[in-house]
Regions:
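Conserved class I S-adenosyl-L-methionine
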Residues: 1-33
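SAM-dependent methyltransferase
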Residues: 133-187
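Class I SAM-dependent methyltransferase SAM/SAH-binding core
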Residues: 47-86
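A short glycine-rich, Lys/Arg-flanked "PGG" loop and its adjoining helix->strand segment in the class I
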Residues: 113-125
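Class I SAM-dependent methyltransferase "Motif I" SAM/SAH-binding loop
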Residues: 39-43
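A short acidic, Gly/Pro-enriched loop at the edge of an enzyme's catalytic core
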Residues: 88-95
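A conserved beta-strand element that flanks and buttresses the S-adenosyl-L-methionine
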Residues: 97-99
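Conserved beta-strand signature within the Rossmann-like core of class I S-adenosyl-L-methionine
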Residues: 126-133
């Protein structure tokens, strides 16, 4: 299942995720205005910055996701369609962050370096940069191939209580973990 092609499902899955909220808010307060989020998706984390009264810019590769984010926040924020590996904005930011494992969409060292170079070019001299990434336990990477494991708790979607089940396949050589998600309705 490609959750990036189902915007309502993407939002439903991530709606209640908040483990990163306190850290992002704390660092934003320390860094100050303005703030840039890379891989902003539909804007789940934008509200944290808006609530601080800061100028927020969100960048995402998906024009559809950016359209949803713009509809949610209107003129209180700026959302830009762009690639975190090669963006050129006309200003610098005191705080740049990439939330919820999105940095891991850079699948090679070259892609990661391009992203980090763009961040460096857009970060003020004393600015702060936060990357949230998943560091898996090896037992997660080497789970039984083809076996379904719960990936989310129950959530509401399309009038039903649902959960995501996943399988994964880890490639030792490339260090890429390929997840496949399946939506299951409860009951």
């Amino acid at each position: 299942m490609d959750i990036y092609s189902k915007l309502e499902l993407y939002d439903a899955i991530h709606r209640h995720y908040s483990r990163d909220s306190e850290l992002i808010t704390s660092i934003a307060k320390r860094a100050g205005n303005p703030v840039l989020e890379l891989a902003a998706g539909t804007g789940r984390l934008a509200q944290l910055i808006v609530d601080l009264g800061y100028n927020y810019t969100g960048l995402d590769l998906s024009g559809e996701f950016i359209d949803v984010a713009r509809a949610k926040y209107g003129k209180r924020t700026t959302f830009v369609v762009g690639d975190m590996q090669q963006f050129h904005l006309s200003k610098q930011f005191n705080f740049i962050f990439i939330g919820f494992n999105s940095f891991l969409h850079n699948l090679t060292d070259q892609e990661a370096n391009r992203c980090l170079n763009c961040v460096r070019n857009h970060l003020t001299k004393d600015g702060l940069f936060l990357v949230s990434i998943f560091i898996p336990d090896p037992s997660f990477l080497y789970r039984e191939t083809g076996k379904l494991y719960p990936a989310t708790s129950l959530f509401e979607y399309d009038g039903s209580r649902c959960r995501i089940m996943e399988t994964n396949e880890f490639d030792d050589e490339t260090q890429v973990n390929q997840l496949t998600w399946r939506l299951e309705r409860d009951g």
